[in-house]
Curated annotation (Swiss-Prot):
The keyword Signal does not apply. Mg(2+) binds at S51, T72. The lineage of its organism: Bacteria, Bacillati, Mycoplasmatota, Mycoplasmoidales, Metamycoplasmataceae. This is Probable GTP-binding protein EngB. HAMAP family: GTPase_EngB. One of its GO terms (biological process) is division septum assembly. Necessary for normal cell division and for the maintenance of normal septation. Residues 36-198 form the EngB-type G domain. Belongs to the TRAFAC class TrmE-Era-EngA-EngB-Septin-like GTPase superfamily. EngB GTPase family. It holds the Pfam family MMR_HSR1. One of its GO terms (cellular component) is cytosol. InterPro entries: G_ENGB_dom (IPR030393), GTP-bd (IPR006073), GTP-bd_ribosome_bio_YsxC (IPR019987), P-loop_NTPase (IPR027417), Small_GTP-bd (IPR005225). GO terms for molecular function: GTP binding; metal ion binding. GTP binds at residues 44-51, 70-74, 88-91, 155-158, 182-184.
């Protein structure tokens, strides 16, 4: 009986994957990296849509989202149907948190990006309406200095015009960084992002 249930569960899982339904799951929240497997890291300022992007990739709501910045304050780990790990890092630059909390978040981020971490690639997410900020430039310099592969994801392009998007792409070109314009909300260009995650 148990074998039959397992068989039907495996068939159901296979059909979900075959039909394009993402089989993602939340693993755990940690103040430091609690896994040694290769992983993709998502980082950005508070409220740029990191958690919304995780949900869009998973095709279901597995990450908690909020209109209030600073919701994510730990490392949140997820795994997809291919057993790949994804990490949603705390957002930086939110002024309305206490200095103690800000220092804690800074320590978590700095601790995660140590040179010996098993990070396959880092995706720094921007709010396309705002563009690059000084804090983004500092974070970009730090990640590159640590030797990690970096991609820029300009999110919320559904709320921008062609001129703003052209400026963003030109800024990325000057920085010599790969930049992808996306909308986690409308799922624009998520298929191109999926290719980078292969």
């Amino acid at each position: 009986m148990v074998k039959c249930k397992l068989f039907f569960w495996l068939i159901s899982w296979f059909l979900k994957v075959k039909n394009g339904e993402k089989v993602w799951k939340f693993l755990r929240s940690c103040p430091e990296n609690c896994y040694s497997d290769p992983q993709f890291a998502f980082i950005g300022r508070s409220n740029v849509g990191k958690s919304t992007l995780i949900n869009a990739l998973a095709n279901k709501k597995i990450a908690k989202t909020s209109t209030k910045p600073g919701r994510t304050q730990l490392l949140n780990f997820y795994k997809n149907e291919s057993e790949k790990l994804f990490v949603d890092l705390p957002g930086y630059g939110y002024a309305a948190v206490s200095k103690t909390k800000k220092d804690q978040i800074d320590r978590i981020i700095a601790g995660y990006f140590q040179k010996d971490q098993p990070i396959s690639a880092v995706f720094l997410i921007l709010d396309a309406r705002v563009g690059f900020t000084n804090l983004d430039y500092i974070m970009i310099e730090y990640i590159i200095k640590q030797g990690f592969k970096l991609h820029i994801l300009a999110n919320k392009i559904d709320k921008t015009n062609q001129s703003t998007r052209a400026i963003l792409l030109n800024q990325c070109k000057k920085l010599k960084l790969n930049c992808l314009l996306i909308s986690a909300k409308n799922k624009n260009n998520l298929s191109k992002l999926q290719e980078l995650l292969e």
